[in-house]
Amino acid sequence: MAVGKNKRLTKGGKKGAKKKIVDPFSKKDWYDVKAPAMFNIRNLGKTLVTRTQGTRIASDGLKGRVFEVSLADLQNDEVAFRKFKLITEDVQGKNCLTNFHGMDLTRDKMCSMVKKWQTMIEAHVDVKTTDGYLLRLFCVGFTKKRTNQIRKTSYAQHQQVRQIRKKMMEIMTREVQTNDLKEVVNKLIPDSVGKDIEKACQSIYPLHDVYVRKVKMLKKPKFELGKLMELHGEGGTGTATKATGDDTGAKVERADGYEPPIQETV
């Protein structure tokens, strides 16, 4: 047998000695996720992030996180087929302040609307809000039987489909172009845009199940903390009450553990 160290044996003693198990959750912190003031329920839940260590700052790991929440949870409502995407834009103390990032219909709702003997009409348009957000809106609508109609099918002619699609694009452009993001979200919550399209298209062909089925965020303006604070109900004032999240429209405060962002230049 060759004389020398046995490299396979661990330094501490016996071969295969157990490693010290470290709980990964001991290095992590819980942060509250806060929805903007447009919604009734402000406290969405909690999110987990690794604690600040050296150059790795916890708040940097949280910024840009997207949360998908049902509108039923945001509005304390029974209508649960709309999902809103909210993105973390800033961290104040233990609160993640979010902003609107997109909207979608649930898959089961979309599947339940598609049926035989009717025409499905879809349209999409890219529109810029007054405060510089570029959104892509997708709309969907279905033809329905006229009153006293005996025929089983209710198919629209190609010319009618084109007219309805044009009307959809006009209304979506008008509703978004003349408003800022906050007002657009307030219109998306009850889907007043879909109802307007349904009314406007009655003269061309009667429609039902008209919805803005999806909203995509394409471009955002440069981030401004003041505007985000306004969305969360702080209205530009320096002092505000702490956001508990249990009540509706609560304000967010900079907590004691607030870490200012690191500046690249002094």
From Swiss-Prot:
Spell out the InterPro entries in the cross-references.
Answer: Ribosomal_eS1, Ribosomal_eS1_CS, Ribosomal_eS1_euk
Q: Compositional bias (Basic and acidic residues) spans?
A: 244-257
- Kindly state which keywords UniProt assigns to this record, in alphabetical order: Cytoplasm, Nucleus, Ribonucleoprotein, Ribosomal protein
Pfam family of the protein (one)? Ribosomal_S3Ae
Give the main location: cytoplasm
Q: Which GO terms describe its biological process?
A: ribosomal small subunit biogenesis; translation
Q: Any idea which GO molecular function terms this record carries?
A: structural constituent of ribosome
What highest taxon heads this organism's lineage? Eukaryota
Q: Where in or outside the cell?
A: Cytoplasm; Nucleus; Nucleus, Nucleolus
One cellular component term from this protein's GO annotations in UniProt: nucleolus
Specify whether Transmembrane helix is a keyword of the entry: no
Q: Name the segments for region: Disordered.
A: 234-266
Return the PANTHER family for the record. Answer: 40S RIBOSOMAL PROTEIN S3A
Q: Which family does it belong to?
A: Belongs to the eukaryotic ribosomal protein eS1 family.
Record text on subunit structure and interactions: Component of the small ribosomal subunit. Mature ribosomes consist of a small (40S) and a large (60S) subunit. The 40S subunit contains about 33 different proteins and 1 molecule of RNA (18S). The 60S subunit contains about 49 different proteins and 3 molecules of RNA (28S, 5.8S and 5S). Part of the small subunit (SSU) processome, composed of more than 70 proteins and the RNA chaperone small nucleolar RNA (snoRNA) U3.
Checking HAMAP family in the record gives: Ribosomal_eS1_euk
Q: What does this protein do?
A: Component of the small ribosomal subunit. The ribosome is a large ribonucleoprotein complex responsible for the synthesis of proteins in the cell. Part of the small subunit (SSU) processome, first precursor of the small eukaryotic ribosomal subunit. During the assembly of the SSU processome in the nucleolus, many ribosome biogenesis factors, an RNA chaperone and ribosomal proteins associate with the nascent pre-rRNA and work in concert to generate RNA folding, modifications, rearrangements and cleavage as well as targeted degradation of pre-ribosomal RNA by the RNA exosome.
From the Swiss-Prot or TrEMBL record, give the protein name: Small ribosomal subunit protein eS1
